[in-house]
Amino acid sequence: MEIRPTTDEDLDVFVDTVHAAFGRFPETPVEGGGLWWSALEMDRCLLALTADGRPVGTAAAHSFELTLPGETLTPAAGVTAVGVLPSHRRQGVLSAMMRHQLAELRSRGEFLSVLLASEAPIYGRFGYGPATYTARLTVPRHEAAFAVPRARGVADTPATGSDNGSVEVLRRAECGKILEEVYDRYRRAQPGALSRPHRWWALRAGQPPISPAPRYVAVHRDADGVPDGYASYSIGEPETLTVDETIATDDAVFTALARFVLGHDLVTKVVFKHLPPEHPLRWQLADFRAGQVSDDTDWLWVRLLDVPRALTARGWFTDGELVLDIDDPFLGEHGRYLLTVRDSKADCVPTDRDPDLSLDISDLGSVYLGGTAPSTLVRAGHIRAHRPGAATLADALFRADRSPHCLHWF
């Protein structure tokens, strides 16, 4: 079997192969773009071929920026389009492609790789761990009354129904530039968020609101008329308003947009897709049970390729030190590192000291952004704590300034 990078001439073969791997047929091109594969970077795609040259597997990567805790932006490879023909499953094709791809990412100097897992059991064995989570919240419109905030000093805010800004409803085709600018402001401050390169917006490659699918967009503007949030939505049967994504530069803007869509006439319920599981919207409702959570699941998976570089890249919010014993069975690597945090900066160096925690590289990916507490994985039997208090200290160290969240599909 040969694994080789692709060129522009391989696009049709690559697309046909990945669709065949998933048992689907390629979509018909539509006016205005919108085909997901139009954003592929062909110099970052791989084809697996049999000895006689038949393509049987695919893998690709996008060039993204990932926001880390502390509002640090760093390059990250967004792995996608991974598939193997059903006729060649269980023959080592996927493992060979993953090993080839990880080596290629390292040769590019990249130390983080991320993906969305089609099936959860697949990617842990390649060193990826679930790092952000998402949920769907459904609110019956007749139960959508907001509670009166109990905290002092919150008068005249969207939480109380007061908003100095304004909301304008536009069609998706009218506001692409606004969406791109607002999303970019949002993702730079949100740990776990990925960039959406300009070419994605220009090609309309992705899911709504990037794609040209018909959508209405509620655009929020501040008191000076500057756009600072949006909600992309559509109304379908049975009388349901579905919000693809709500992007807001702060909680007040989100609340204003939530009030707007929950007040829409001629619908019986509003469905918010891709909310963080701990989002405060349920707490803002007068009836806590009115907001029904479903599809609570993983979203972004993270894989570290260089432990010291990755740990020193993110921001930290508690001083302390830990010795981490890290096993990377897929790449056949093992390392022990002393992580020292002082004044929000980390130093990470090899050490022969006794470990505080022993963990798999996939578990380090899960805790890296602060969305999974190390103590949770200790209790689950995945991380081993070698001394009392080690898990508690790890929780404090890896905590993020803001819960990580990603809603970008790729």
Residue spans for each PLM region:
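Hydrophobic, small-residue-rich alpha-helical packing segments that form membrane-like cores
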Residues: 3-12, 18-20, 33, 47, ...
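Conserved active-site alpha-helix within GNAT-family acetyltransferase domains
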Residues: 107-111, 116-137, 277-294
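Intrinsically disordered, low-complexity, positively biased terminal segments
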Residues: 2, 7, 11, 69, ...
